[in-house]
Amino acid sequence: MKTLRNVLILSLLCTLAFGCKQEPDPFREALGAYILRGQTGTFDLFSIQKIDSTTFRTEFERREHVFQRKMEEETVLYGSYTMQRMPKNAARHWEAMQRTEQAIKGLDSLRTVLEGRLDEIAYYDYVFSGQSVIGEEVTNYLGAFASMTPELEVIALCSERRDLHKSGGHAIPGYLQMLRRTGEEEEE
């Protein structure tokens, strides 16, 4: 009986020792790497909750809306400066209209390339709480928001949910390169 009890205790201790080995959380690892950005420090994730997801189709619609709104604004400004006979200002807005038009065409090209993946998830939105320590600097993330691709690439980190989708186009493959080619700046 004493031997059986010792065997059970030993089995329980072994189970606890091997069962307590915790696998690293890939989300925590990716978010921590983004927050630390290569600096020496630690990141502890206290809580995480997925709050939304966005498909490529929805993200393309958002980006198209952003560029169409910018085109409308530039067109109004161009017309206004032309009427006021201010050719330098009008020329600047004409150039902005041309860049925006190129960005819209580039977005259409990217959409064509991704046609078969439009209904796939581009990124997920999360609300989380955590803490990073870099040197002596401690940063608390209480109710912070993050957008992450299914491949665990962080594309946005912010304190306000309304700011979360400003970088959403970054989830579209080729989007940043297209912006660089057109010289267009992204605005939300």
Residue ranges and their predicted role:
Residues 1-18:
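Sec-dependent bacterial lipoprotein signal peptides
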Residues 20-188:
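Cystatin/cathelin-like cysteine-protease inhibitor module
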